[in-house]
UniProtKB/Swiss-Prot annotation:
One of its GO terms (molecular function) is cytokine binding. This is Noggin. Belongs to the noggin family. The gene is Nog. Disulfide bonds join C67-C104, C90-C140, C96-C142, C119-C127. One of its GO terms (biological process) is hippocampus development. Homodimer. Interacts with GDF5; inhibits chondrocyte differentiation.
Length: 144
């Protein structure tokens, strides 16, 4: 599919590079592990794919439908402590389904407590740190 303008080019390449370095990790989803890939083979024949080919097809399918969380540092600015937080995002530049149509979307998040410097002018200026709950994407899933 077509490219965005030159503005996001370097960011897109960095994101894609990070995605390509990531391989599906953990346990293979049971929906993929259970696939026999026997559809379309001649009926009535005891034809089965070799274990090696079946595994390759499963790994390919898993790599196409895998939705990793991509992490990047985000600067919240001088009014926050911690100023820099590592935030997650879901790679959504390509479809994660076969056939195409679904994309990776956030499915779980955790909350990080950061402090924000706030000043109130009522009755003289009073300043102090207030705790803020900052959401961080922790899991992405392939969905509509």
């Amino acid at each position: 599919g077509g490219g965005g303008g030159p503005a996001g080019g370097a960011e897109d390449l960095a994101e894609l590079d990070q995605l390509l370095r990531q391989r599906p990790s953990g346990a293979m989803p049971s929906e993929i592990k259970g696939l026999e890939f026997s559809e379309g083979l001649a009926q009535g024949k005891k034809q089965r794919l070799s274990k090696k080919l079946r595994r390759k097809l499963q790994m390919w399918l898993w790599s196409q439908t895998f939705c990793p969380v991509l992490y990047a540092w985000n600067d919240l600015g001088s009014r926050f402590w911690a100023r820099y937080v590592k935030v997650g995002s879901c790679f959504s530049k390509r479809s994660c389904s076969v056939p195409e149509g679904m994309v990776c979307k956030p499915s779980k998040s955790v909350h990080l407590t950061v402090l924000r410097w706030r000043c109130q002018r009522r009755g003289g200026q009073r300043c102090g740190w207030i705790p803020i709950q900052y959401p961080i994407i922790s899991e992405c899933k392939c969905s509509c």
